[in-house]
Amino acid sequence: MKVLALRHSVAQVYADTQTYVHDDSKDEYENAFLISNLTTHNILYINYSVKTLKILNKSGIAAVEIQSPDELFALIRCNFTYDYENNTVYLHDYSYYTNNEIRTDQHWVTKTDIIDYLLPGWKLTYVGYNGKDTRGHYNFSFTCQNAATDDDIIIEYIYSSELDFQTFLLRKIKERMTTSLPIARLSNRVFRDKLFPSIVNIHKRVVNVGPRNESMFTFLNFPTIKQFSNGAYLVKHTIKLKQERWLGKRVSQFDIGQYKNMLNVVTTIYYYYNLHSSKPVIYMLGSAPSYWIYDIRQYSDFTFETWDPLDTPYSTTHHKELFFDKDVTKLKDNSILYIDIRTDRGNMDWKEWRKVVEQQTVSNLSIAYKYLSTGKAKVCCVKLTAMDLELPITAKLLHHPTTEIRSEFYAILDVWDISTIKRFVPKGVFYAFINNVTTENVFIQPPFKLRTLPNDYIVALYALSNDFNPRQDIINLINKQKQSLITVRINNTFKDEPKVNFKNIYDWTFLPTDFEIKDSIITSYDGCLGIFGLSTSLSSKPTGNNHLFIINGTDKYYKLDQYANHMGISRRSHQVRFSESATSYSGYIFRDLSNNNFNLIGTNIENSVSGHVYNALIYYRYNYAFDLKRWIYLHSIGEVTVEGGKYYEHAPIELIYACRSAKEFAALQDDLTVLRYANEIEGYINKVYSITYADDPNYFIGVRFDSIPYEYDVKVPHLTFGVLFISDNMIHDVITVLKKMKTELFKMEVSTSYTYMLSDGIHVANASGVLSTYFKLYNMFYRNHITFGQSRMFIPHITLSFSNKRTVRIENTRLKINSIYLRKIKGETVFDMSE
């Protein structure tokens, strides 16, 4: 949902839009809670409170102040990610298609011939990093840019087996127009750009697990972050390959040589980072034109020194000349060297050309070895060709996508490689490598071992759920790692499936109850965004590839009503109740009936089941931004601090009742996952609370009334206001609690309206208006370690007769309390008090 805050209402009517006027009789938190549970996607918030907007944003719900009709139109028609700390809106708006336009934020693309393969009459527009160059389109009171681009389509095409780009592009645009927006993927770059600076500022040692190409620019500013990926393809791995011949296969209709060179250099940079944790100077031989340097420098400041007889326009220092073996002495330490020297073929015969290429390969290797043989902190990426060669067995082979699969590939060498054993590799084996292996990631660091790192902050986004990681090892890491942000795939199946298919692999699935962690927050993507200064207009879908975000060691843990809170907890319930259910009271009715409470009079006001816990369980797929386990735990230890809102402290037994209702709901829906989740949450409640039951009671609290509007034959008709199991020396403690509660007890507005048979031979009258006070009393006894209440639900009633009688119905009648007393069962009254 998105909340657009206005000072006055608008005449225009928008689809899927609801108006909410700030209620001055309620505080900012209560207004935020009410807004968050509205069911439309767009909320026009009139006469808004700035603090209410802040509360919503910290909860991950995008809430933006609107100052003009243009701002309203821009935000109501698309989804966006909001940096609420810097008041910047990142639109995810593809309406530019109506300009016959596709967009890119990678400059190198604009220097290719891609325009020849677009849809007829279409153009390509460069919009800068995250759409920064579009800021001039929006003259708004907040900073606004459109981060939507088609780079995902371009990159997917490059790695696909398809050659016809126009057909591919058309299909992908049609898919985009007919499927829901993948908001997590679109906002992820914005999220990473907020996340890592904040983590690095606090933690000296940061580990990042499983980065992919979409993160390749993000980490250029963070050389100290230790990366873990899937490892490199080494020369020694070629021993498994059978020899092949030249393939000569076209990969892309438009020239992607620039992209290949950029990937080679970025791969080398990250390889250097993992060795030396600092930024290198970048030397490049055969550099022209290297338009992609512009892209890298948009993200991070690097020094490029280049050699080529042709221009390299974005280089820091360019030498318009050839580079020779003798020039290696010009290259300094703390650097990387990219050797991409290759003479143009021109009209040369292919055999003659082949000789030249092989000579250049030998020359390139000679320069690489000479560069690495002296000095320190050096890494080289060198262009090679398929030929009979000796290479160090630990050299890293690269084959990033290029326009045609021919004879070229690249190798990364460091100062240790040149002193290791070399292996002879025949030309046919290199062709087998070129023909069959595509380097899919610029991060070629070793895989992460699932073990705790006590001194490090671990970030693992979408990286650990794969089933090649033992499931229990994943759980152990999350349970034991003190500081981390780790995601695992949520179990949103209905058959409680332990693993699910994802692309060509399987992922383990998890529920919050799989983990035993303290001082940690378990939430959704949008809940996590709120913790790091962002919010989003579109929540994750209830099904599909969604993840739990588990934040260990956060200082936000005790801020229960600010982050990963209960905002939106009833939204799905409202959607169902007011659209498709038998009555809008269906949830209240079911919760009472499933706990054998058949008095449904006032069920929406007076009920014994925690609606928060019930909704958090049965609709967890919709509202898992709410950290239920944290909420339960902080209540159990009495560490709940709230800034505002309508706060009600549940008695622990109310939470148990909610679990029982949720289990029955799950059984009726054949939802095995909710069934297990509710069982495990009930177990967790029993673990963190010390709940005892007076199922064999020896005392009871009675309430006498001035008069009863029914016939009765018991000596003194009374309301049994709970039973206790206590020793005689605890009587004083019970009386102390009753005295503290005296005012509230006598303020109860008790009423009755019918009689019924509680069981065979027990005729009783219903009693309404007492449950909220009963649970307050329960909590007082619980905190004083006094066993009060039974395991079955408390059903307030007044015993009239121990014989079978017919039901009597009367007008709802108020009962005046005469006295409240404590009496031993089958014994004497030990305490009595009157108003």
From Swiss-Prot:
Its main location: virion. It is found in: Virion. It catalyses: a 5'-end diphospho-ribonucleoside in mRNA + GTP + H(+) = a 5'-end (5'-triphosphoguanosine)-ribonucleoside in mRNA + diphosphate; a 5'-end (5'-triphosphoguanosine)-ribonucleoside in mRNA + S-adenosyl-L-methionine = a 5'-end (N(7)-methyl 5'-triphosphoguanosine)-ribonucleoside in mRNA + S-adenosyl-L-homocysteine; 5'-triphosphoadenylyl-(2'->5')-adenylyl-(2'->5')-adenosine + 2 H2O = 2 AMP + ATP + 2 H(+). GO terms for molecular function: GTP binding; hydrolase activity; mRNA 5'-cap (guanine-N7-)-methyltransferase activity; mRNA guanylyltransferase activity; RNA binding. Residues 171-245, 429-555 are annotated as: N7-methyltransferase activity. Keywords: GTP-binding, Host-virus interaction, Hydrolase, Inhibition of host innate immune response by virus, Methyltransferase, mRNA capping, mRNA processing, Multifunctional enzyme, Nucleotide-binding, Nucleotidyltransferase, RNA-binding, S-adenosyl-L-methionine, Transferase, Viral immunoevasion, Virion. Residues 556-692 are annotated as: GTase/RTPase activity. Pfam families: Rotavirus_VP3. One of its GO terms (cellular component) is viral nucleocapsid. The active site is at 718 (for 2'-5'-phosphodiesterase activity), 720 (for 2'-5'-phosphodiesterase activity), 797 (for 2'-5'-phosphodiesterase activity), 799 (for 2'-5'-phosphodiesterase activity). The keyword Magnesium does not apply. Its EC number is 3.1.4.-, 2.7.7.50, 2.1.1.56. Residues 693-835 are annotated as: 2'-5'-phosphodiesterase activity. Residues 246-428 are annotated as: 2'-O-methyltransferase activity. One of its GO terms (biological process) is viral process. Contains a bipartite N7-methyltransferase domain, a 2'-O-methyltransferase domain and a GTase/RTPase domain. The C-terminus contains a phosphodiesterase domain that degrades the 5'-triphosphorylated, 2'-5' linked adenylate oligomers produced by the host cell in response to IFN stimulation. Belongs to the rotavirus VP3 family. Multifunctional enzyme involved in mRNA capping. Catalyzes the formation of the 5' cap structure on the viral plus-strand transcripts. Specifically binds to GTP and displays guanylyltransferase and methyltransferase activities. Has affinity for ssRNA but not for dsRNA. Capping activity is non-specific and caps RNAs that initiate with either a G or an A residue. Together with VP1 polymerase, forms a VP1-VP3 complex positioned near the channels situated at each of the five-fold vertices of the core. Counteracts the host innate immune response thanks to its phosphodiesterase that degrades the 5'-triphosphorylated, 2'-5' linked adenylate oligomers produced by the host cell IFN-inducible 2',5'-oligoadenylate synthetase (OAS). The host RNaseL is therefore not activated. Interacts with VP1. Interacts with VP2. This is Protein VP3.
